[in-house]
């Protein structure tokens, strides 16, 4: 594995990320959610892609792709491992979203290219990174109240908003992926909340990928 080459690719790709609002349709008619996991001891990469109507946030379509994992887990290079399955799921969608939430980092990455940014560049769609853990940078401790907010900073640059979306839950790290500003990323996530820790697009993507009860109930209703 030539990490120097991958690192150079990351730096080059990161320079092409658009950190300004460039939505083709604003407000969007459809918002997507994406989640990636691994099966069979990491040998299979599974990507779930969901499509929600906006502003109702009703689930209207989902696709799950499973492919052979193409590279091992290497911290800082996860997007190279995840994007092939994401691309496979994306290509199956009959309707593409106007805005995509990705479970993972956007520019809140040591080389400013998390999976939300990498995938957003690949398919040229506005993306937002919604991550559950910090990858780099520092932030002031949050109060325990829901709605508590702090800027994630690294080398004098704001990379994300750290936002406690729900009481007694760890905060989310919300960042530009591609073609969405940092402040708009936070605003869009806040518009897509329904009382859970995660915004609806990534909550549904996780539910589909993991076969959670909410998704099982949804399937039964569709029959």
Curated annotation (Swiss-Prot):
Main location: cytoplasm
Subcellular locations according to the entry: Cytoplasm
Cofactor needs: Mg(2+)
Residues engaged in binding Mg(2+): 35, 103
Enzyme class per UniProt: hydrolase
UniProt-annotated site: Interaction with target DNA, residues: 73
UniProt keywords, alphabetically: Cytoplasm, DNA damage, DNA repair, Endonuclease, Hydrolase, Magnesium, Metal-binding, Nuclease
Gene3D superfamilies: archaeoglobus fulgidus dsm 4304 superfamily
EC number: 3.1.21.7
DNA repair recorded as keyword: yes
Catalyses which reaction(s): Endonucleolytic cleavage at apurinic or apyrimidinic sites to products with a 5'-phosphate
GO biological process: DNA repair
Record GO terms (molecular function): deoxyribonuclease V activity; magnesium ion binding; RNA endonuclease activity, producing 5'-phosphomonoesters; single-stranded RNA binding
HAMAP family, per database record: Endonuclease_5
Function summary: DNA repair enzyme involved in the repair of deaminated bases. Selectively cleaves double-stranded DNA at the second phosphodiester bond 3' to a deoxyinosine leaving behind the intact lesion on the nicked DNA.
Family of the protein in this entry: Belongs to the endonuclease V family.
Name used for this protein in its record: Endonuclease V
Organism: Salmonella arizonae (strain ATCC BAA-731 / CDC346-86 / RSK2980)
Gene: nfi
């Amino acid at each position: 594995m030539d990490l120097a080459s991958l690192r150079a690719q990351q730096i080059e790709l990161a320079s092409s990320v658009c950190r300004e609002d460039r939505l083709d349709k604003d407000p969007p008619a459809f918002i997507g959610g994406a989640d990636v996991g691994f099966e069979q001891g990491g040998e299979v990469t599974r990507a779930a892609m969901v499509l929600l109507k906006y502003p109702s946030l009703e689930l209207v379509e989902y696709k799950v792709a499973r492919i052979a994992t193409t590279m091992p887990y290497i911290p800082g290079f996860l997007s190279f491992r995840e994007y092939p399955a994401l691309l496979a799921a994306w290509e199956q969608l009959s309707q593409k979203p106007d805005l995509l939430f990705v479970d993972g980092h956007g520019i809140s990455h040591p080389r400013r290219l998390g999976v939300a940014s990498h995938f957003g560049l690949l398919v040229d769609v506005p993306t937002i990174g919604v991550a559950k853990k910090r990858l780099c940078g520092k932030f002031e401790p949050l109060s325990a109240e829901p709605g508590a907010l702090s800027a994630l900073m690294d080398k004098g640059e704001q990379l994300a908003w750290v936002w406690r979306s729900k009481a007694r839950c760890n905060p989310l790290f919300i960042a530009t992926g591609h073609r969405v500003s940092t402040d708009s990323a936070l605003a869009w996530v806040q518009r897509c909340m329904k009382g859970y820790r995660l915004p609806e697009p990534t909550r549904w993507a996780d539910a589909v990928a993991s076969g959670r009860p909410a998704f099982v109930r949804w399937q039964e209703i569709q029959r």
